[in-house]
Amino acid sequence: MRTEPDGRWSRRAGLMLAGALAGALALLGSVRAQGLGLPDLVERAKPSVVLVGTYRETDSPRFTFAGTGFVVGDGLTVVTNAHVLPDPSQPADGRVVQVHTWQGGREWQARAVRVHVVARERDLAVLRLEGGPPVPALTLAAGPPPREGSDLVFMGFPIGGALGFAHVTHRALLASITGLVLPQVRGQALSPRAIRALRDGPMDIFQLDAIAYPGNSGGPVFDARTGEVVGVINMVLARGTRESVLSQPTGITYALPVALLHPLLNDLPR
C-alpha cells in the first residue's frame, strides 16, 4: 500500500535543508573572505603604501629611509608618523622630506612633498605630494573603532632597506583598546611627551598581538574584513608614555586609531 508523505514532515525537511544550505553558504563565504580577501587586500593596498625619508644631495645614498606612509583622500595626501620626519628643533642641514611611490616590481619613483601639518602630541603628520599624478588612495574607516578581538592587517617596510624595499604584510589581533598613559604612573616617571599627552586629555590606542619593527612606523592598519584603514602603526609614542614604567620596553605593537587622524584632514580634498 502506497502512503503519502506527511505534509508537516516535508515542510520541516525543507526548512532543515534550507538552513543547512544557508550555513554552508555562510561558511563558504567566510572561507572565501579569509582565503581570498587578504591577497586581494594586499594587492590593492601596495601602490598606496609608500616609503618616507629624507633626500640630501651629499648623502650616499641620497635617499635615507625613515618610515612608512600611506596615501589617502585625493591621492596626493600622505599620512605618516611625526617622528619619521626630521626634528624641527635641530639646525637645518640640507635634508628635505621625500616620498617614494611603488611602480611595480622593484621600481620606485621619488616624489617631492611639502609638510602640510604635524601633530607631535599625536605623533601624526600629513604631507602633500607636489607635482605628478595622484596615487591610488586607501579608504579611512569613518565609523566606530573595530571591536577588541577583531582581525587586523598592517603593512610597511620593517627594518627599512636592510632587507630591500618590499611591502611586508602582517596579520594581527586587536588585543586591547587601552589608554595611552597609565593613570598610576608617578610624575617623575613620565617623559615630556607623556606629560603633554596627559595635559591634552585621555587618548585611546590599539594594542596588537603582532610584532612590528623599525620601519613599520607610520604604516596603515586595516580591518581585515572591510579593507578600510582603522589605525596607524606607532612604535614611539606608547614607548615613551604607557611603557615608561618598564625598565625594558616590551615587544608589544601599538597603533593610533584613525579617529585621531580625521581632524588633521578636514581642510584637504577628499
Tell me what each language-model feature is.
Residues 73-120:
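Catalytic-histidine neighborhood of serine endopeptidases
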Residues 16-27:
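Bacterial N-terminal signal peptides
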Residues 36-38, 55-81, 111, 218, ...:
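A conserved glycine-rich beta-strand in the N-terminal activation segment of trypsin-fold
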Residues 9-16:
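N-terminal export leaders
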Residues 72-73, 91, 146, 224:
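Short, well-ordered loop/turn sites that connect or cap secondary structure elements
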Residues 45-62, 130-138, 168-266:
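Active-site region of chymotrypsin-like
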Residues 30-33:
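Sec/Tat signal peptide C-region and signal peptidase I cleavage site
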Residues 40-41, 88, 116, 130-166:
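Active-site substrate-binding loop(s) of clan PA
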